[in-house]
């Protein structure tokens, strides 16, 4: 075997020892796996969360439009003679609960309550409404329900599932624990 090459001659004395060099290489490899892998996993977590909250095709955007339709429905129903203030207040409280909810799971639970409150208000108001009010109520309910269908068909939950599947495997599970990365919440 030939002698050491020029680069090896330039190494500090401790790194000329083969065992030290192997240990340093292992540390460098582990550092790159956990460092680069952690950064990639954190970016994946961020993009999964953004699928819920960012952009005009996100659940958050459709939920905002759904809340606007619910608020419009309360305005129209408030002009229908005989509709109880309690039923209107129920929808307004449910709107507030959706706005106050943190995270996909809490938003989904609050949205389910909003759905029930809106349908109760619509059922009460439509019986008492004149033709013009009926058309306005039906239009707002149709928009409200259309946004609900769009939310149900959104691909966020499948993206969250893919992320969670990735996070549950090795070494992602260990890297995620070191980086403080948690599973994505589902909108259910």
Identify the function of each model-found stretch.
Residues 1-188:
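A helix-centric hydrophobic-segment signal that preferentially recognizes long
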């Amino acid at each position: 075997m030939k002698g050491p090459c020029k680069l090896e001659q330039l190494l500090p004395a401790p790194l000329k020892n083969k065992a030290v060099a192997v240990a340093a290489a292992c540390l460098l490899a582990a550092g790159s796996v956990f460092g680069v892998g952690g950064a990639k996993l954190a970016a994946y977590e961020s993009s999964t969360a953004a699928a819920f909250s960012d952009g005009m095709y996100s659940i958050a955007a459709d939920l905002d439009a759904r809340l606007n339709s619910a608020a419009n429905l309360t305005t129209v129903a408030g002009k229908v003679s005989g509709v109880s203030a309690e039923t209107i207040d129920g929808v307004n409280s449910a709107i507030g609960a959706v706005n106050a909810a943190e995270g996909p799971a809490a938003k989904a639970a609050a949205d389910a309550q909003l759905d029930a409150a809106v349908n109760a208000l619509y059922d009460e108001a439509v019986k008492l409404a004149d033709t013009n009010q009926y058309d306005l109520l039906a239009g707002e309910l149709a928009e409200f329900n259309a946004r609900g269908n769009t939310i149900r068909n959104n691909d966020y939950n499948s993206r969250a599932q893919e992320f969670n599947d990735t996070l549950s495997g090795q070494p992602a599970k260990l890297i995620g624990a070191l980086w403080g990365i948690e599973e994505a919440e589902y909108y259910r």
